[in-house]
Amino acid sequence: MKFHRSSALVVGLVVALPGQHAMAWGDEGHEIVATIAYARLTPVVKKKIDSILAADKDKLTAPDFSSRATWADKWRDSDRNTTRVRYLATHNWHFVDIEIDSPDFDKACFNHPPLPAGKVASKGPADDCVVDKIEQFTAELRSSSTSKGERRLALKYLLHFVGDLHQPLHGADNHHDAGGNAVLILFGNHKVSSKSLNLHHYWDTDLVLQLGKDQKAVADQLNNQISPQDAATWSTGTPKDWAMESFDRAKTIAYDLSGESNRTDKNGKTVPYLDATYDNRALPVVREQLSKGGVRLAAVLNDALK
């Protein structure tokens, strides 16, 4: 999940939310995307990636490909409650907040700040978006002049950011609600005595877990359902194109609570209750976005390391 802009209003809203986490898709979703992608790497690229990751001594995650897809969240949050150096330097990189009522992609990407002369992408401006970072890290992974350490970082960031880009609420914002973090909801078996969760968390984790709790099994099932035609179509386009897809899914599906009834949580707040009708619209989007994320991550890596 993401913690957005420095606006005092947004900070106050997000900090006050219960169940706040610092991940996108949750570990489960990122591992599903990565597992699909790994199965679609060419043998040559798979060997190169295995070699890059084998030299990685970082202990924030397990060393395998799918676990490394969660690394960028772990790194960002490793000093979130202390010095906040890593957190403040990288937290904006996980999303592109396109306002649903007045979409402005360039504004959501902080007007695309260039990398300062002599700076690598992992040391780039803190005010930048996930689309720019995917493009920068892809260029570094492709370049033979990139140092081994920076190439390893580029790979780990790409494993995560391509997944982030496909979570619809990482591509949209509704009047500074931090991509749905400030939208309180109840769902499932949550009764009046429950605490509210938030819409962003619901898309990060709760909907993904409805697909199954064995991430590899879910990934294998989704991967097996991807037709060659879909894989070919999904592999085209640019990160900006993919961001606009996520924006559309957020605007038309994730944020559409118009048909939901309300319930009162234990704190006396009246909030939308997401029922089976909402899930029946949302779950196909979750399946498709996870599948697209896996196909596109593989396409990015296969092209950069061919």
Language-model segments: which ranges?
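Residue-level detector of transmembrane insertion/anchoring sites
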Residues: 10-11, 156
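N-terminal signal peptide c-region/cleavage motif recognized by signal peptidases
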Residues: 16-21
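Short, Lys/Arg-rich amphipathic segments at extreme N-termini
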Residues: 11-14, 34
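N-terminal, motif-rich segments that launch catalysis or mediate targeting to/interaction with membranes
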Residues: 23-161, 168, 173-306
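Bacterial N-terminal signal peptides that target proteins for export
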Residues: 1-10
